[in-house]
Amino acid sequence: IGAFIRQLDNLITLHQRKFEKLTNVKKSMLEKMFPQNGSSYPEIRFKGFTDPWEQRKLTEFVEFFSGLTYTPNDVQENGTLVLRSSNVSNGEVVDADNVYVNPQVVNSENVKVGDIVVVVRNGSRSLIGKHAQIKAFMPNTVIGAFMTGIRSECPEFTNALLNTSRFEEEIAMNMGATINQITGYMFSKMEFKVPCLDEQKKIGEYFEKLDRLVTLHQRKPFLMKWRT
């Protein structure tokens, strides 16, 4: 039994190291595959793409949708799930402190696969801009009023863009000094360098695969510990 536990510990450590390595790779590639310091050209590109990236307002290539405002009286044990900041962790939608409301009070649209949900108001300043992409069909699920939803033609690219330091800088520049929130008007002022749609798709596919690997090695140690 002792040998088995040691072997399991070694496997857990291996997955933790792979997770850390892949996280560092992702951070590095976000810097190299997106233009830096005002440049119109990223350091690394896929073959066949040479055109400069264009400066565009965020509102030119994404659409926003609002969250649901509800009262304590609307909350019940089951019904329509309302995604809040607690449901966003490490770029994923998770089950955590779930809130359900009576479906009859829901007047906002259901989330769709590919949607990106973003925390736009929170008591903790560091949580503003935290986001996750909807990866699977989630029936009877909306976002809360302190969230905003983003839809785009290439959601994987948009999700990667929101993971860049440039998005963090835009949030820091636009966020109020006293109120921890990003408004629709603030989003409308944000500008980013973006490539043509075909290059967006290539970049989006790359980071989607990388995210799957990161998630795999992040979950493995937890599952191994849980099974023991």
Describe the role of every protein-language-model region.
Residues 1-11, 15, 54, 201-213, ...:
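Extracellular/lumenal glycan-associated surfaces
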Residues 17-51, 219-228:
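Short amphipathic coiled-coil heptad-repeat segments
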Residues 45-68:
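Non-catalytic DNA-recognition/assembly elements of restriction-modification systems
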Residues 47, 99-102, 148-150, 190-194:
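Short, well-ordered beta-strand elements within core beta-sheets of diverse protein domains
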Residues 71-102:
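DNA target-recognition patches
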Residues 84-85, 96, 103-165:
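A short beta-sheet element
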Residues 141-145, 176-201:
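A short glycine-rich beta-alpha junction/loop motif
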